[in-house]
């Protein structure tokens, strides 16, 4: 038998699931309205495309859940099943909310101008948002993390927030960097870009934790795997900050060019 095994007999409380679904559906509805307003004001459907992209990223959830040790009960209101794993409706809504809204907000912030330090603050804010969101959800037990999870706080393995925060940051940075390309019908290219970015960042940042989650090693090595995920995430954020962040704080004059002095 393969190890670790998900808790196949786990069941979700239907009242809690209903509340979660309604709350997230309301957030998605508001976000969609705002995305259409943004389209009307700017003439660009990019925010709407990012909302769609956020939901599309959901297709990778069964894969990352398999290697990352996450399970959703089979009695959930299931949107679809893949890799033998049921994916609930509320999770699809959560993808629209977290990845769609977060990427849009970061992209707009980059267009206004972010210093490299502020890029780091955005990453930390995204991690904090994921931590709060999942900590609240896990009190209602609509899903569970299993296996040899590193860096567990309560019911939440902290390494997940590094991955989940890096995805919208990298995606927003790519769109900002090549903003002139995503015009007209080419705005639709945001969707495959989002899918590719999600897959790449999940693998690039999450692999150290994936290894220890699915391997019975010593506790210390398990925690090292989680810390390694944070280390890789920091490298990714540093690259993003240096690529799209403003080196100097707004309003701070750039240093004058040095003049050559003749001997």
Which positions does each model-derived feature cover?
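Aromatic-rich, lipid-facing transmembrane alpha helices and their immediate juxtamembrane interface loops
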Residues: 1-263
């Amino acid at each position: 038998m393969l190890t670790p095994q998900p808790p196949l007999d786990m069941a979700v409380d239907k009242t809690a699931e209903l509340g979660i679904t309604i709350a997230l559906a309301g957030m998605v509805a508001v976000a969609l309205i705002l995305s259409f307003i943004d389209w009307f004001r700017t003439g660009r459907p990019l925010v709407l495309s990012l909302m769609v992209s956020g939901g599309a990223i959901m297709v990778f959830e069964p894969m990352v859940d398999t290697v990352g040790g996450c399970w959703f009960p089979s009695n959930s209101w299931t949107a679809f099943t893949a890799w033998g794993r049921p994916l609930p409706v509320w999770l699809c809504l959560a993808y629209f909310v977290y990845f769609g809204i977060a990427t849009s907000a970061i992209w707009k912030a980059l267009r206004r101008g972010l210093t490299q330090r502020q890029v780091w603050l955005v990453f930390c804010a995204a991690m904090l948002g994921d931590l709060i969101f999942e900590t609240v959800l896990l009190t209602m037990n609509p899903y569970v993390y299993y296996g040899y999870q590193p860096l567990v706080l309560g019911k939440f393995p902290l390494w997940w927030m590094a991955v989940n925060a890096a995805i919208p940051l990298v995606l927003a940075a790519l769109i900002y960097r090549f903003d002139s390309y995503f015009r007209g019908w080419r705005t639709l290219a945001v969707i495959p870009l989002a899918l590719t970015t999600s897959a790449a960042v999940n693998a690039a940042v999450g692999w150290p934790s994936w290894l220890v989650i699915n391997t019975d090693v010593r506790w210390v090595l398990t925690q090292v795997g989680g810390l390694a995920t944070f280390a890789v995430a920091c490298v990714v954020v540093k690259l993003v900050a240096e690529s799209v962040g403003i080196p100097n704080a707004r309003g701070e004059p750039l240093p004058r060019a040095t003049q050559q002095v003749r001997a």
